[in-house]
Amino acid sequence: MTKEDNIEMQGIVIDTLPNTMFRVELENKHVITAHISGKMRKNYIRILTGDKVTIELTPYDLTKGRIIFRSR
């Protein structure tokens, strides 16, 4: 699967879960579980409840995603 196959969406973090997992509500009101991408983890980017984030989803499982950007 190539990078172009992934779906990018905007969302808001509504809950923090253990092991750097987050519950995110997307713009279309769906709630998914997301984890932090490796570069965000490496650079110690903090994500808190209420932050606007960009999520990358695969077409195979639309209930799990990866947080790739935190908006200011």
Curated annotation (Swiss-Prot):
Where's it found, cell-wise?
Cytoplasm
Keywords recorded for this protein, A-Z: Cytoplasm, Initiation factor, Protein biosynthesis, RNA-binding, rRNA-binding
User: Quick one: a GO cellular component term?
Assistant: cytosol
Asked whether the UniProt record includes Transmembrane helix among its keywords, one would answer: no
Q: Which residues form the S1-like domain?
A: 1-72
Domain of life of the organism encoding this protein: Bacteria
Q: Check the record and name the InterPro entries matching this protein.
A: NA-bd_OB-fold (IPR012340), RNA-binding_domain_S1_IF1 (IPR006196), S1_domain (IPR003029), TIF_IF1 (IPR004368)
Q: Does the keyword Ribosomal protein apply?
A: no
Coiled-coil spans are none
Pfam families (UniProt xref):
eIF-1a (PF01176)
Report the GO molecular function annotations: ribosome binding; rRNA binding; translation initiation factor activity
What PANTHER family does the annotation carry? TRANSLATION INITIATION FACTOR IF-1, CHLOROPLASTIC
Q: Which family does it belong to?
A: Belongs to the IF-1 family.
Subunit structure of this entry? Component of the 30S ribosomal translation pre-initiation complex which assembles on the 30S ribosome in the order IF-2 and IF-3, IF-1 and N-formylmethionyl-tRNA(fMet); mRNA recruitment can occur at any time during PIC assembly.
What is this protein for, i.e. what is its function?
One of the essential components for the initiation of protein synthesis. Stabilizes the binding of IF-2 and IF-3 on the 30S subunit to which N-formylmethionyl-tRNA(fMet) subsequently binds. Helps modulate mRNA selection, yielding the 30S pre-initiation complex (PIC). Upon addition of the 50S ribosomal subunit IF-1, IF-2 and IF-3 are released leaving the mature 70S translation initiation complex.
Under NCBIfam families, the record lists:
infA
Q: What is this protein called?
A: Translation initiation factor IF-1
- Species the sequence originates in: Buchnera aphidicola subsp. Schizaphis graminum (strain Sg)
